[in-house]
């Protein structure tokens, strides 16, 4: 899709976006469980997240699993689930139109539950040095007050 063809995903038109959708996390969950907002953020200490975040691409879900695990000091590499939105959703404003125009990561957020319908077991994480680079970059942004989450 070219930049000129990109159209924002809103609560009104999100039905046009087709999955599968993925959610990466540090939590070992069960198929059938609902992911709901209102829990402590994995990315900002002391913040309660008003949204649940998900993506139509596996790569951002891998980052979600690895970062939520690493940033909170949890064991393991994290988990990736196949999820279905139960309500409307919109582009994740934390990634959309930031470094690149549009929503190239196909990342979304919702205030409605996501239902876990499957688990991705066969995924390859990032090399340790690549993951550490990302963590160092995020921590630097946090120190400089630049890692504000729009929730």
Range-by-range predicted roles:
Residues 26, 33-34, 74-151:
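Active-site and NAD+-binding cores of ADP-ribose-processing enzymes
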């Amino acid at each position: 899709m070219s930049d000129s063809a990109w159209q924002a995903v809103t609560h009104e038109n999100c039905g046009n976006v087709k999955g599968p959708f993925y959610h990466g996390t540090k939590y070992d969950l069960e198929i059938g469980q609902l992911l709901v907002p209102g829990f402590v953020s994995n990315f900002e200490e002391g913040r309660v997240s008003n949204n649940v975040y998900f993506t139509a691409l596996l790569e951002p879900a891998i980052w979600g699993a690895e970062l939520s695990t690493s940033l909170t000091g949890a064991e393991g590499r994290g988990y990736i689930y196949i999820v279905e939105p139960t309500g409307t959703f919109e582009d994740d404003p934390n990634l959309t139109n930031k470094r690149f125009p549009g929503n190239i990561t196909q990342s979304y957020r919702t205030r409605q539950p996501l239902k876990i319908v499957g688990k991705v077991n066969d995924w390859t994480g990032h090399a340790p040095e690549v993951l550490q680079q990302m963590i160092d970059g995020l921590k630097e942004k946090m120190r400089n007050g630049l890692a504000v989450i729009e929730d």
